[in-house]
Design a protein with these regions (language model features):
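Glycine-rich beta-strand-centered segment in the early N-terminal region that forms part
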Residues: 29-46, 56-99
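NAD(P)H dinucleotide-binding glycine-rich loop of Rossmann-like/cofactor-binding domains
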Residues: 71-78, 88-154
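Short amphipathic alpha-helix with an adjacent loop that forms part of the alpha/beta core around
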Residues: 204-215
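Short glycine/proline-centered loop/turn elements that form peptide/ligand docking sites
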Residues: 82-86, 177-187, 201, 205, ...
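N-terminal Rossmann-like NAD(P) cofactor-binding module of classical short-chain dehydrogenase/reductase
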Residues: 94, 151, 198, 220-221
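Mid-domain Rossmann-like dinucleotide-binding core that forms the NAD(H)/NADP(H) cofactor-binding site
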Residues: 123-202
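Glycine-rich phosphate-binding loop and adjacent beta-alpha segment
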Residues: 189, 227-300, 334-335
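C-terminal hydrophobic helical "lid"/dimerization subdomain
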Residues: 1-2, 278-335
Length: 335
């Protein structure tokens, strides 16, 4: 049986993930059967949700990784051998068997990517699950309306940078982001069109937010949770909305705020809604048309931080979780 190099979970991480929590090993490649194709992966996505799946607790929307078993996630690759009519050799495809150099994929759960619409990396970022998450969190979840003030936490990362740009392109009146570091904040304002960016590492977020959004916030797109979430509730408008996309602060060492802050949700009559993007698949064609159009006209900045080689995937994930990336975090596996 053929095998491929793959990233395996070496142990359950502590509160802070380190690169040695994973290791590179091999996994078997199943035989090619009708409806399947062998893909050489070119790029794979690094996502905060990967860290959550390393814990043993049950998740309601996906499966958790087993110690000694391979990781998986979104990837882009080229078909090198095929027993599927819809997947000719040479086609570029997006699928869910990343974290390995080769994969046998089922044509029923694969997206064939049009490289005339966007480059391969964009199909993992602005046109991938990253962009789709931002789009869903703003529209069906967040109910964004023209002229509103939007706050995005974790705005220097993949989903956050897309959420802020999408909000601007969809007609938001003011877009404020939070990010860790002066470089990220400058990029958000100068390149991505944010009106203001708060450097939470060098300033007090709770003090700076009312200055950045003096009329208070209509919609808060939260990727971070923790103290930023708690502080933002004090700057929400009456009947404001919160789209809860993630809580990456849970994976760090910082103490978490008391749930007593949720009284602000009562006093301000807030709508706080968590979401999983796969619940909105019926929206994907609209999303791809609209975002593809923005890419074609140059209205959208799609930046990636790329780590080279499967052996560096663990370090890349550790960097992502510590906020080292600017925009989308990817691993390049092959040309």
């Amino acid at each position: 049986m053929k095998q491929t190099a793959a990233v395996l979970l070496a142990r359950r991480p502590g509160r802070t993930f380190v690169a040695d929590d994973v290791t590179v090993g091999t996994v078997d490649l199943p035989a090619l059967t009708p409806g399947h194709a062998l893909v050489r992966n070119q790029y794979m996505s690094l996502d905060p949700s990967t860290r959550g799946r390393m814990d043993p607790g049950e998740k309601q929307y996906t499966t958790n990784f087993e110690v000694g078993g391979p990781l998986d996630g979104s990837a882009i690759g080229v078909v090198v051998e095929s027993a599927a009519d819809s997947l000719p050799v040479g086609a570029t495809v997006r699928h869910r068997l990343g974290w390995r150099e080769y994969a046998v994929i089922d044509e029923a759960v694969v997206t064939v990517c049009d490289l005339d619409t966007a480059p391969a990396t964009a199909w993992l970022s602005s046109l991938g699950q990253t962009g789709f998450t931002a789009y869903a969190g703003l529209l069906p979840v967040g109910q964004l309306a023209a002229g509103e003030t939007v706050l995005v936490s974790g705005a220097g990362g993949a989903v956050g940078s897309m959420a802020g740009q999408f909000a601007r392109l969809l007609g938001a009146g003011r877009v404020v982001g939070s990010a860790g570091g002066a470089q990220k904040c400058a990029w958000l304002v100068e390149d991505c069109g944010f009106d203001h960016a708060i450097n939470y590492r060098d300033s007090d977020f709770a003090t700076e937010l009312p200055k950045a959004a003096p009329g208070d916030i209509d919609l808060f797109f939260d990727n971070v949770g923790g103290w930023q979430f708690a502080s933002a509730l004090h700057s929400m408008k009456i009947h404001g909305r919160v789209s809860m996309c993630g809580a990456v602060s849970n994976f760090g060492t910082q103490d978490q705020p008391s749930t007593a802050v949720l009284i602000e949700a009562v006093l301000r009559r807030l709508t706080i809604r968590g979401f999983i993007v796969r619940d909105f698949e019926d929206l994907r064609p609209q999303f791809e048309r609209q975002v593809g159009g923005w890419l074609a006209t140059g209205a959208l900045v799609d930046r990636a931080t790329i780590v080279e080689g499967i052996e560096n995937a663990g370090a890349g994930l550790a960097g992502l979780l510590s906020g080292a990336n600017l925009g989308k975090a990817l691993v390049k596996l092959s040309d």
